Design a protein with these regions (language model features):
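Active-site metal-binding loops of divalent metal-dependent hydrolases
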Residues: 8-10, 37-40, 65, 90-92, ...
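Cap/insert and terminal regions of metallo-dependent hydrolase folds
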Residues: 65-69, 85, 175-186, 190-279
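Active-site metal-binding motif and surrounding structural segment of the metallo-beta-lactamase
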Residues: 42-93, 217-224, 250-253
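Structural motif
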Residues: 31-33, 59, 148, 194-196, ...
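Conserved beta-strand hairpin/beta-sheet module of binuclear metal-dependent hydrolase folds
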Residues: 2-50, 180, 184-199
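Pre-active-site segment of Zn-dependent metallo-hydrolases
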Residues: 16-17, 31-59, 102, 168, ...
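Binuclear metal-dependent phosphoesterase catalytic core
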Residues: 265-266, 274-299
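Metallo-beta-lactamase
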Residues: 93-185, 277-287
Length: 299
């Protein structure tokens, strides 16, 4: 398995473009999966510079509906064949906002403080573009290609990983409520070395999500994690607990990035031996050896 980061906040090599977003190109056998598409079009230009032909993409998956993860698809769509499978999760078209007051929701003041963050397109847009392969999934776990899975329907995180109160969504009655990110999904690749997990932002809590992955693949060890862990706005205690989780796990590569935030990245760099600096241009492949251990370290 090979992955290439096409779009991220940071760049690892001169000549590539950064943006606040995330896009990862995954190669596994004959599968060419684009996991998220960034905010604008950095993933397109970076792919060209990295020698990746996005017209060869065999499937697309969106981690959630925020524009920094699927906004770039508005420019990418014309490159793809109309029947390419495109996977979102149920709830993808629920409108989302960020409340800049960073306070618990107060309905009467929303209109003055909210920024619309997703989705950047409506359901009709896919059909107007002739993209007949678009699907909204409702599965806990679905295999979309050999060894490649999408997982959704995560349990609500505990109080230590609660969704930030500034994340709100449109409720069933049209009123705004705390966002539960029902559309969030992660990609899991089952390799001989263990499970490789790709996250978008892990709004439902990175520890909670990885624990769910372990429960759904009970015989397989976690080997690597790439993507956002949503440790912003920074909470030093939450960051420390998250770093401890990774440090005491058997995860051999922690390519946390994007919404992990500057403080989170610094703590990971200082305390997690498995941490791998991740940005646009990163190319990573699974090692050839197989791992048999599973679970977590005792200390």
């Amino acid at each position: 398995m090979k992955l290439t980061v096409l779009s991220e906040n940071a760049v690892l090599y001169p000549g590539l473009e950064g943006e606040f977003g995330l896009s990862v190109y995954l190669e596994e056998g004959d599968t060419r999966l684009l996991f998220d598409a960034g905010e604008r079009d950095a993933c397109l230009r970076n792919a060209e510079k990295l020698g990746i032909d996005l017209r060869r993409v065999t499937a697309v998956a969106f981690s959630h509906n925020h524009r920094d993860h699927c906004g770039g698809f508005l420019r990418l769509a014309e490159l793809l064949p109309p029947d390419v499978p495109i996977y979102a999760h149920s709830g993808f078209f629920i409108r989302k906002w960020w409340d800049h007051r960073c306070d618990p929701p107060q309905q009467e003041t929303y209109s003055q403080t909210l920024e619309l963050v997703g989705p950047p397109m409506e359901a009709s847009w896919f059909f107007q573009q002739g993209l007949t392969g678009f699907r909204c999934l409702a599965d806990d776990c679905i295999q979309i290609a050999p060894h490649v899975y999408l997982l959704g329907n995560f349990p609500a995180p505990g109080p230590e990983e609660a969704v930030h109160p500034s994340s709100v969504m449109e409720g069933p009655d049209g009123r705004l409520v705390l966002d539960t990110f029902p559309e969030e999904q992660v990609c899991v690749v089952d390799t001989p070395a263990g499970l490789v997990v790709l996250t978008g932002c892990a709004h439902n809590g990175i520890r909670s999500i990885l624990s769910t992955v372990e429960r759904r693949f009970p015989e397989r060890p976690l080997q690597a994690v790439f993507g956002g862990t949503h440790l912003v706005p920074p909470d030093p205690e939450r960051i420390a607990r998250t770093a401890d989780y990774f440090r005491h796990s058997f995860i051999t590569c922690a390519g946390v990035c994007h919404c992990t935030g500057p403080m989170g990245l610094e703590v990971f760099a200082q305390t997690v031996p498995a941490y791998l600096p991740t940005g646009a241009g990163l190319v990573w492949q699974t090692p050839s050896f197989a791992r048999t251990s599973a679970g977590r370290k005792e200390n």
